[in-house]
Amino acid sequence: CAHACYNVGNQTEDLDLAEVYKSVDMFFSKMDYINEFVLIGGEPLLYKDLSKVIVYIGNKYRRKIGIFSITTNGTIIPNEETLKVSQKYQVLYRISNYAKELPRLRQSHIKLIKRLQEFEVDYKLYDEDGYWIDYGFDYLNNDMDEEKLIQTFDRCLTPCREVRGNKLYFCVMARSVSDNLHFNEGQDDYLDLEQLNDDNYKKILLEFNLGYSEKGYLDMCHRCHGMDAANYPIPIAEQLV
């Protein structure tokens, strides 16, 4: 990422291009249609092969995607090739707005939006008055019985899935935080898309997406405020240095 924000993990490594392609192919081999498919980071515009990824997804799977989007903090101007393929495959740029905390970003937003408009690329700049919520991952370690874990999971039911290779994760935050903070929890909390070979796989996918599993919760739930995280607002994009 181009920022060094407090309360944000910073130890994630880029996926290599082959792994990105595998993730995309595996995901869409099982999906008929998805409302929104998002490329996220860190900062996706720092990924050197971003234009190749957009072309790969656009060529093979754009018809299966409602909204094809990229989430960016607005600090990086995409190169011309990335802008061209973004226009071709109707990519929406979702621009997080941290200008209240980092006023210099207002000029960055102006420059970015100007380039997006030049190439007729859709974008959405969010309001400055946003805030982040503290999930508690870096300090919570609740001793919860199975019933409490299931209650926490059922109240949350995050809508944000993540695909990595053949693995579909129910909660992108649980997977990424466990890896970034080296908790090594929830190693088996995923659906193996490669194993969905029988005629009943769509039912299995639907059940997974609705939150049904043998355990009924994720291992990382005991480290998370879950739905109550909304009661723990924190300053947006507060910098470490």
Language model regions located:
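Canonical Radical SAM [4Fe-4S] cluster-binding loop centered on the CxxxCxxC motif
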Residues: 1-19, 215
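Active-site-proximal loop/turn and secondary-structure-junction residues that shape catalytic pockets
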Residues: 43, 74-76, 99, 129, ...
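Loop/helix-junction capping segments adjacent to catalytic residues or to phosphate/diphosphate-binding pockets
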Residues: 47-48, 102-106
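Conserved strand-turn element in the central/C-terminal portion of the radical SAM core barrel
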Residues: 95-102, 121-152, 157-159
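Basic phosphate/pyrophosphate-binding loop/patch that engages nucleotide-derived ligands
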Residues: 105-125
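A structural signal for short, well-ordered beta-strand segments and their strand-loop junctions
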Residues: 69, 94, 124-127, 161-164, ...
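Conserved SAM/AdoMet-binding glycine-rich loop
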Residues: 6-7, 20-95
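Accessory C-terminal segments flanking Radical SAM cores
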Residues: 140-241
